[in-house]
């Protein structure tokens, strides 16, 4: 476990806080807490990547939509010409520029599913003694699907959700964590609430509440069995209670004038 660079870390110092998890695991929710209203949105035009300068720290990506962070990085790649920088590469470059300056938050589903690119970033940051904090969210499938369904219902979509699509993205996140632990990277793995608490500890320079979870490996055998159950379900649907409470209500303001004689 590469703790040497992490032990003396103070929030605001150079460093990367990378939060990983599947759709609906709460990655963006955690990061949004650390984007103050006065944050200045900036952009690396050469790599097509936006980030927030929050004074003491940076946040990579955009957060105007639910799917933000690194998933909102567009890069400069033109599929018609095959030229430019792909979104994943652009995110890596942005992290490489920002994290050695001051604490940088980065999260995204796609970035979280790969180990090779993350290890490359880790090794590159290590050259400048920049610590890489790898936070991986462990969420029960039911909570993940409930979270995604709620988000969809709030946006006006009450259609059934494919269980296969999300389960497919979940396993690579855990597989990359498994490789990271084996490679000796600093990792911590726990439920969303636990990860949120530990990130807050780091931000406020407190000892980590759940330091015993550092280096914890995922149980991929158990995960595969649970994933198969959800694969077999095919789809899940929002409850009627969820729809009644959260589905956007139609508005009638401004219609009265049409009916006046």
Curated annotation (Swiss-Prot):
Keyword DNA repair on entry: no
Keyword annotations: Host-virus interaction, Inhibition of host innate immune response by virus, Restriction-modification system evasion by virus, Viral immunoevasion
Signal sequence interval, chain numbering: none
Domain of life: Viruses
Gene Ontology BP annotations: symbiont-mediated evasion of host restriction-modification system; symbiont-mediated suppression of host innate immune response
Keyword Disulfide bond: no
Reactions accelerated catalytically: 5-hydroxymethyl-dUMP in DNA + ATP = 5-phosphomethyl-dUMP in DNA + ADP + H(+)
Function: Phosphorylates 5-hydroxymethyluracil (5hmdU) into 5-phosphomethyl-2'-deoxyuridine (5- PmdU) on DNA as a step in the pathway leading to thymidine hypermodifications in the viral genome. As a final result of the pathway of hypermodification, 5-Nalpha-putrescinylthymidine (Nalpha-PutT) substitutes for about 50% of thymidines in the viral DNA. These modifications probably prevent degradation of viral genome by the host restriction-modification antiviral defense system.
Family affiliation: Belongs to the thymidylate kinase family. 5-hmdU DNA kinase subfamily.
Identification of the protein by name: 5-hmdU DNA kinase
């Amino acid at each position: 476990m590469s703790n040497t660079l992490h032990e003396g870390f103070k929030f605001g110092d150079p460093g990367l806080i990378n939060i990983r998890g599947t759709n609906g695991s709460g990655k963006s929710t955690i990061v949004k807490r650390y984007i103050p209203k006065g944050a200045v949105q900036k952009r690396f035009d050469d790599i097509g990547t936006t980030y927030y300068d929050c004074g003491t720290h940076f946040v990579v990506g955009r957060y105007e939509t639910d799917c933000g962070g690194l998933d909102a990085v567009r890069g400069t790649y033109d599929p018609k010409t095959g030229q430019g920088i792909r979104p994943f590469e652009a995110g890596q470059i942005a992290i490489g520029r920002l994290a050695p300056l001051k604490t940088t938050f980065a999260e995204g589903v796609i970035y979280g599913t790969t180990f090779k690119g993350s290890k490359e970033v880790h090794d590159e940051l290590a050259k400048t003694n920049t610590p890489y904090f790898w936070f991986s969210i462990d969420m029960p499938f039911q909570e993940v699907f409930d979270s995604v369904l709620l988000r969809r219902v709030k946006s006006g979509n009450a259609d059934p959700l494919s269980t296969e699509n999300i389960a497919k993205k979940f396993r690579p996140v855990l597989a990359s964590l498994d490789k990271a632990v084996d490679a000796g990277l600093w990792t911590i793995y726990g439920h969303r609430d636990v990860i949120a608490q530990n990130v807050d500890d780091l931000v406020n320079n407190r000892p980590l509440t759940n330091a015993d979870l550092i280096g914890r490996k995922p149980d991929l055998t158990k995960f595969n069995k649970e994933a198969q159950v959800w694969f077999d379900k095919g789809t899940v649907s929002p409850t009627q209670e969820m729809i009644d409470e959260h589905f956007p209500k139609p508005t009638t303001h401004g219609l009265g004038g049409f009916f006046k004689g």
